Amino acid sequence: MKKIVIILASMLALVAMTSCEDLLEEKNYGNPTVESMMSAEENVVLLVGQAYADTKWLHDHWGYWGVASLTSDECVCPVRMPGEHWKDNYYWTRLNNHNWNWMGDAFKNIWNTTISGAVLCNKLLATLADAKESMKAEVYAQYVGELEVLRSYYYYMLFDCFGRIPYLEEFVDKTEPLMEPEQVWSHLVNCLERNAPNMAVVTDANRAANYGRVTQGFAYALLARLYLNAESFGCTPENIGLANNKDFREDFVSIQSPADFYTNAVKCCDKVINAGSYSIEDDWFANFKIDNSASKENIFVIVENGNGEFDLRYIGSMSNKLRVPILTLHYSHQSVYSMVEKPWNGFAARPGFMERYNEKDLRGPGPIPPAAPEPPARPAKMTDAELAEYNKKLEAEYHGPLKEYAKTVQGYGTQSAKQWGWFIGPVFDKNGEIILDENKIGSICRIEIASLEAANWYDGARCTKYEVDKAGQYQYAENDFVLMRYADVLWMKEEAILRGGAGTSGFNTPDFQKMLTRTMAYEQNPKEAFAAAYPGVVTLQLEDILDERGREFAWECVRRRDLIRFGKFADSDYVDYVTAKQKFREWFPIPYSVLEKSKINEETGERYWKQNEGYDDIP
């Protein structure tokens, strides 16, 4: 069975599935109460399943994934010429160079959808509380834990973006000043530590039933992420009093020094590792296949359905469907890959990011083909007559060399016999000719990008870690989107130890070594190839771990926070195109539409909710 799909309509089926003949008979079934329905665990599963609906907004380019990726070194969306594709009033450009402001739907979308998910969790928790007496104690504890951990994840995504957020653990209409980052961090840590022991532990027997749901492994992995990033969130031993004041700490240490944050991160990782629920896949790409539900490395995913007619919803331009392959691939990929939806030729990798891959690393672009012939410079605007003359010039000066070039790059690009994490090179037709785009230019993706504001259609490497549907079955991506991987747990542990956390390194364990060597699977001796390619990783140099995390987790929603943690977020020598370097940009601006709705404090006459430091508040 490929996946467990959570369908809200299933709840209605409990009372609606009767035949016409049954309806004609006068039978009194009584009026089932919520309490009586909750006595059956399968009904609790359906009820709690509703809370996952808002996770599907997280991976859109108009949502969390978009801003997390575009503001880091792993992703860029340049304005493409001719036609000013993706200009959008330079919205994407401002994310790329860190000059964003409060305008832009993504910030509003992130706020609204994560809050919506958290509020629904609180509402369902209230429903469970009302029915507590009719439920088994262990069932109640497990599903309360599931909802509280999922709520923590919604809040975490909001917190990661804005820092100061309206954190509530009950279903009430209540307005208070936004909670400060260190307070939010403390509440999240408390909630996760309290609930993790009650969560389902994944085994081979229950893996399918827990697929796409938060589990104990996820709770501890998210907790590890909070501890590892505590200092980047502004937490200190002195300002997190709540996190040190509890009676359910288990074996976590009290935070008396910065090193204690990292010790607890190690402990969280060890809980995931020692549970034996997860393992590193032999094939890195197994985690991102069209059907990746068999992966034992993926801890938490968004369960997708690529059928455009199934549960397709929009919020403005944002959709609840996975559109990563459509976002990144060149327009010409559609005919070669038999894609239902024409790609949008937008998102790509920043050139500096691609330099961090060894050409033997399958997560990268692979061997770089020879440089393609350059087409004649094209004026930004032309009359019809000038365009006709330009096309004649292309035919005379460019198309001939392009045909000759095609003969020298057979086996590259779409003809590659090997799978790579990024696409560069020619897009060939079935006859081995390079496909011309609508401008009669060869579709040859390259690593280089001319500029943020005037890139070519073919500029930038395209992310292909998620398997592309080449059978034309799905309008959108059917691959389940990965939110947490076991590989991340292994790397978080090693980094936490290097930062001063107490614990025993797992670097030489079979899983960790497999995680490294599988990246060189095309080589005769993968271990030697990895050591030669990335010596700083093998010797566990902290700066090299940042590079390795980039290679391993590209476009998986972790890079922005990684850069902030390593002090590289505003480093223009490390992150291409960054021009704004203010410290306050480590948080995003709270949307005006949110601030405008803030209630007024009757004592002060001011709004309860204030803008983040550095950004313009509402006049």
Label each PLM-derived region with a short phrase:
Residues G104, K108, L362-G366, P370-M515:
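C-terminal substrate/ligand-recognition segments
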Residues E21-W92, I165, E193, R213-Y220, ...:
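An aromatic- and glycine-enriched ligand-binding surface/loop that stacks and positions planar moieties
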Residues A40-H59, G63, G83-F162, V172-Y211, ...:
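Conserved, well-structured interaction surfaces
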Residues L14-M17:
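Bacterial Sec-type N-terminal signal peptides, specifically the leucine/valine-rich hydrophobic h-region
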Residues S19-C20, T114-G117, R249, N274, ...:
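Long, intrinsically disordered, low-complexity segments
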